[in-house]
Curated annotation (Swiss-Prot):
One of its GO terms (biological process) is DNA repair. Residues 4-235, 261-489 form the ABC transporter domain. ATP 1 binds at G36, S37, N38, G39, S40, G41, K42, S43. Keywords: ATP-binding, Cell inner membrane, Cell membrane, DNA damage, DNA repair, Membrane, Nucleotide-binding, Repeat, Transport. Probably not involved in the transport of molybdenum into the cell. The keyword Cell membrane applies. It is found in: Cell inner membrane. It comes from Escherichia coli (strain K12). Belongs to the ABC transporter superfamily. Disruption phenotype: Not required for synthesis of the molybdenum cofactor or for the uptake of molybdate. GO terms for cellular component: ATP-binding cassette (ABC) transporter complex. This is ABC transporter ATP-binding protein ModF. SMART domains: AAA (SM00382).
Amino acid sequence: MSSLQILQGTFRLSDTKTLQLPQLTLNAGDSWAFVGSNGSGKSALARALAGELPLLKGERQSQFSHITRLSFEQLQKLVSDEWQRNNTDMLGPGEDDTGRTTAEIIQDEVKDAPRCMQLAQQFGITALLDRRFKYLSTGETRKTLLCQALMSEPDLLILDEPFDGLDVASRQQLAERLASLHQSGITLVLVLNRFDEIPEFVQFAGVLADCTLAETGAKEELLQQALVAQLAHSEQLEGVQLPEPDEPSARHALPANEPRIVLNNGVVSYNDRPILNNLSWQVNPGEHWQIVGPNGAGKSTLLSLVTGDHPQGYSNDLTLFGRRRGSGETIWDIKKHIGYVSSSLHLDYRVSTTVRNVILSGYFDSIGIYQAVSDRQQKLVQQWLDILGIDKRTADAPFHSLSWGQQRLALIVRALVKHPTLLILDEPLQGLDPLNRQLIRRFVDVLISEGETQLLFVSHHAEDAPACITHRLEFVPDGGLYRYVLTKIY
């Protein structure tokens, strides 16, 4: 029986990036779905399975005789090439309508009219065979390319994002055709963006995060794992309404168009050694910033200025939430606008308590709960738990029984219950494995995009940023100091 096996595989993506596939076996007749967000490495996985990526370490062994990979990029190129014929000298004598027919596209590599007709019947596109390919709809072009791939009778077919750009009816129709292919004995691999795209017939599944195959297994068992189930739940949250704050947010007292942070030529030094050196930075309403740089660059020092904790804040031209530092404001005038989560807070949260109580403690800015909790606060926290996809059993389980990423996510929600003006996440991915990192990024995107809180996301690497980031402040080594690069993310 044919199979493809990868053991401790490291595949080259670029000079600085690799794809990690610890262990994977595809047997003849299997149907697999691999799910990952943009940048997770799922398209690289498709190429690795097809034997198109250099193997740096480990083993890749395949007994499949004919592997075919199809991607959305290939489809786009084919359509583009057909339209390009109008702008070239590829016109034949007397030809006034350039572009090949659907039948010609299907038989591009294998000329076999009876098989072409058989496949067209199987995919319901016989009426399109004489039509110019470039005039077909997205769903029709997808079926045409599948027919083209099947002309050569592959024994392993890899489809990269086959449902992308299709409407609900077209997705269902394509899934039914793929189920028929699977029943005919073809080994099938689907690479997908979302868990809810996995067709019912699929037997096995895997999850990619940070260019690592993080989990694999029988589909139903995998989808029931707590982390995977929570990631799948996050796909259903678009447009969700966040729970109200228990009391009106301090944000509402701020003028709508007033900058949240203004630092002009900021300087902080220790023993005459500059830590921040003439940094000018402004955070306007609606902006979400990533602050990125190596250890010792001054990121934490900048955060301590923003939170009002650094004594040299008074000697700088610094305005926080409309109040110039040193103008009579108290530390609490600043902190009422800020939610803060760091790995050190995570380590400090050592009290023995439940997940529910950790989130409730956000209403009191305490580690643990030492006062009465109102019925309204209990109801609001239940709404937050529902958004996180945490059931009652898990909510009332010990906080430290959750995965490290789930704990950190609970602390992020703890910081959000008051709907602060600014949420500061200081190295929120530190110490997390790829799947937990993906969990944090995904929920941060949801929670920030559906609310009005602004984000400061601090990390070592630009690629750590969640999708909601609009601007980046980068600390770049420059001699013995650092220079500052401010970028708008498009």
